Amino acid sequence: VFWDQDVRYSLPTPTPQGLEQPPLGTPVDLSTRLALPAAWQGRPLLLHFYSPDCPCSRFNADHVAGLLQRYRDQVVFCEVLEADRAHADEDSGLGLRQFVDADGSLAAALGVYSTPQAVLLDGQHRIRFRGNYNTSRYCSDRNTEFVRLAIEALLAGQTYEPPPAATVSYGCELPDAEA
């Protein structure tokens, strides 16, 4: 089992046919998909796409916890769980506000097709980053901490241009995103 999973999750997640990923800078209307508290309006939002069934989601929990600890006063962190789960109440243990993407429409609108993935939106809900947390499975390569780099750029008023490695998904396919 170990070797099977090691090989499986070291390869990119197959890209679904017909996948549409909105370009960075695209505004996203969240009003019909997420019930965001008024206090979150105008604040950057990090959507952490997570599945407790995905080993890769569990591998990056410590890294996400570090991001949360460092940026929680400046960025709102949310966890998005996939729809068809018998135990959708299981979470990452990070204490994040959870949203269940009941019909997969949020993931589809943002171009997300696997977990773990992150989408960083600015205060006007424009996509500023979509992709991996790191090229390393355990998020241990500081030079490729893509989400951290995107957050730092956003908070500094700069645009982050992610390298191609940041957008190649590794992990578990979402149920409605089969290749």
Stretches with model-predicted labels:
Residues I127-R128, N132-A179:
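Thiol-/selenol-based redox modules, centered on thioredoxin-like
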Residues V1-V28:
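N-terminal targeting signals for export/organelle localization
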Residues L36-V64, F77, I151:
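Short active-site neighborhood of thiol/selenol oxidoreductases, capturing the structured segment around
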Residues E20-P44, H63, Q69-Y71:
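A short beta-strand-turn-helix
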Residues S51-D62, R85, S169-A179:
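Short, thiol/selenol-centered motifs that function as redox-active sites or metal-ligating centers
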Residues G95-R97, V112-V119:
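Structural micro-motif
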Residues R58-G93, F99-A109:
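Structural microenvironment flanking redox-active thiols in thiol-disulfide oxidoreductases
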